[in-house]
Amino acid sequence: MCCFVNLEYLKSFYMTVKHNNISKAAEILHLTQPGLSGQLKSLENELGVTLLIRSNKGVELTEEGKVVFDYADTLLSIQGNIKRDLVNLHQDRPKLLIGACKSVGEYALPCSIYTFKQHHKEVDIHMEVLNSTDVVEKLMDHTINIGIVQFRPKNDDILTKPIVSDELLLVGRSDSDNETSIKRISMGELKLIPLILREHNSGTFYVIEKALKSKGLHIEDLNVIYDLNSPEAIKSSILSGKGFSFLPRMAVEQELKKGNLQIVQIDDLKVCFKYYIISRKNYEYTEYEQMFIDFIISSKRGFC
């Protein structure tokens, strides 16, 4: 058995397991599928063991593969920390790489980032606004180091910390002359009104799907006319009288204050949820990353 392991091959193995799909991992790593398969085979040859069992359902770890995967997680985190710290040594300005779900990233965090920046002008801050699933993926790919999402990921390699509660509201256009201007409906009536939802891999979709299931209702039971991947696009549709949608209060606060949108109460359904800061299990925050997290968790965060 070889004493040295190729870290690139190890990363390819790690990504294949995380995505349970060779083609998906190859796409993310910018490799061809044969190229990725070759790297996996080379890693197995280096270690002298079989790591993966391939099937139509994806890949399955062998007992040896489970051991190597745990070490891969740790080693890749250490590698990321080394690269980050070496880069910081040769840069005058520390960096924050943040990924945030759209509800927080578009409506709340900009003001918080501004406030934090006012107190720490030496920091360069880069934030990507994505849906929650993509935030998790970029965190695990080491593209970002701090994530903020709309649900608690079911991943043992991710640490979560709740930061704030919110509520999903059913909203419609506030217009007494329009047929979409209603203020209260039953669960039965919910199945009839035209709905515009967020896309399937978004945190908002996950939260409402879970809430409806708790009441014995499924998305398929609803009159969903289309889905969009942008809260702003959904609000434009609602304001044009196209239908209703479930959106976080954080995303519709201004429209509610102005009276452009109104809340539609649903009998026996209140959908509350939390936003979470997420991090990789073996990742060590830099001084400024920890300062930013402490700030976001505190009452001084100053959400918009």
Describe each model-derived feature in a short phrase.
Residues P194-G216, T286-E287, F303:
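Secondary-structure junction motif
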Residues T160-H200:
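Flexible hinge/capping segments at coil-to-helix
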Residues N131-V136, M140-I144, V149, L217-L261:
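Hydrophobic hinge/microswitch elements
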Residues E46-L47, V68-H90, F303:
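Alpha-helical linker/hinge and terminal dimerization helices associated
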